[in-house]
Regions:
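Tryptophan-anchored aromatic micro-motifs
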Residues: 30-56, 82-84
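Hydrophobic residues embedded in beta-strands of well-ordered beta-sheets
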Residues: 66-68, 89-91, 113-119, 126-127
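An anionic, turn-rich surface loop/hairpin at beta-sheet edges
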Residues: 89-112
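Membrane-interface motif at the C-terminal end of an N-terminal transmembrane signal
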Residues: 19-34
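N-terminal Sec-pathway targeting helices
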Residues: 1-18
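N-terminal glycine/threonine-rich, aromatic-flanked beta-hairpin/loop signature
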Residues: 51-97
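Edge beta-strand at a domain terminus
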Residues: 32-36, 77-86, 120-149
Length: 149
């Protein structure tokens, strides 16, 4: 084997080792993030659309008194506060009048917060929502959107 072939082989082996180490590091970071979120709770601020019709929008803003809002298919909305349970990825939604509205199960939110999925349990039905944006948006009485930046 010539000197050139040995150099090329060595370069390929080094590149393979580097790529393998990078892959393991990325997997380790994602695993660490998922473990932390499973025990501490995922950051849920943002708004979500239902995955069947995309007509229902569910918004959350934890920093502002744990607010939530659901805008229904007909444009009507329900507002209230939420509270995390002992399982920090299970949320109890209460309307503004204190009446219980439903329960949220946060399935996952990606580390970069560009993907996510949660489930709303209410009136004996389950609706799956997917993350649209991490910028919460709430509808106000006039029908305008109140973008909380």
């Amino acid at each position: 084997m010539g000197r050139r072939a040995t150099s090329i082989t060595l370069a390929v082996v080094c590149l393979a080792v580097l790529l393998g180490a990078t892959g393991l590091f990325a997997i380790s970071r994602e695993t660490s993030y998922m473990q932390e979120c499973a025990s501490e709770g995922f950051a849920i601020d943002g708004y979500y659309r239902d995955d069947k019709t995309s007509l229902e929008i569910l918004a959350f803003l934890e920093e502002d008194g744990c607010r939530w809002q659901l805008v229904n298919k007909d444009g009507s909305s329900v507002d209230g506060q939420f509270k995390r349970t002992d399982d920090p990825n299970i949320l109890i939604l209460k309307k503004e009048n204190g009446e219980e509205f439903g329960t949220i199960h946060v399935a996952y939110i990606s580390r970069r917060r560009d993907q996510g999925q949660l489930y709303l349990f209410r009136d004996s039905k389950v609706t799956r929502f997917y993350l649209v944006s991490t910028k919460p948006a709430f509808t106000v009485e006039s029908g305008d959107v109140d973008a909380d930046v």
